[in-house]
Swiss-Prot record:
InterPro entries: Acyl-CoA-binding_prot_CS (IPR022408), Acyl-CoA-binding_protein (IPR000582), Acyl-CoA-binding_sf (IPR035984), FERM/acyl-CoA-bd_prot_sf (IPR014352). GO terms for molecular function: fatty-acyl-CoA binding. One of its GO terms (biological process) is fatty acid metabolic process. The keyword Transport applies. Belongs to the ACBP family. It comes from Caenorhabditis elegans. GO terms for cellular component: cytoplasm. Binds medium- and long-chain acyl-CoA esters with very high affinity and may function as an intracellular carrier of acyl-CoA esters. An acyl-CoA binds at residues 34-38, 60, 79. Pfam families: ACBP. Disulfide bonds: none annotated. The gene is acbp-3. Keywords: Lipid-binding, Transport. This is Acyl-CoA-binding protein homolog 3. Residues 3-92 form the ACB domain.
């Protein structure tokens, strides 16, 4: 399986995660996944920094800007690793296999594709 296919599977997992419940991403995790996604998909920041009153957009832009110079492939690898690390931590407190039986089957399939 190619890096792009693994990355696409990882992105779909993040998009399909429930918004609430035992496996919900924190704001910091969301920011990490956002910036890695942008770097992996587009490359270096290609827009102006949002104004001071656009707090959320500015945080997102700053997080992406921090990845300047990271290759798109490296950003894809980091995205997948961040997702794997997140599930490793979740597995310390939750029966992930049982949880996976209760949610969108695509998540379980895609976790297998990225090596979980």
């Amino acid at each position: 399986m190619s890096l792009q296919e693994k990355f696409d599977a990882a992105v779909e997992i993040i998009q399909k995660l429930p918004k609430t419940g035992p496996v919900a991403t924190s704001n910091d995790q969301k920011l990490t996944f956002y910036s890695l996604f942008k770097q992996a998909s587009i490359g270096d920041v290609n827009t102006d920094r949002p104004g001071i009153f656009s707090i959320i957009e500015r945080k997102k832009w700053d997080s992406w800007k921090e990845l300047e110079g990271v290759s798109q492939d490296e950003a894809k690898e980091r995205y997948i690793k961040a997702l794997n690390d997140m599930f490793d931590k979740i597995a310390e407190e939750l029966d992930v296999a049982a949880w996976l039986e209760q949610i969108d089957p695509v998540i379980k399939t895609n976790l297998a594709l990225i090596g979980k």
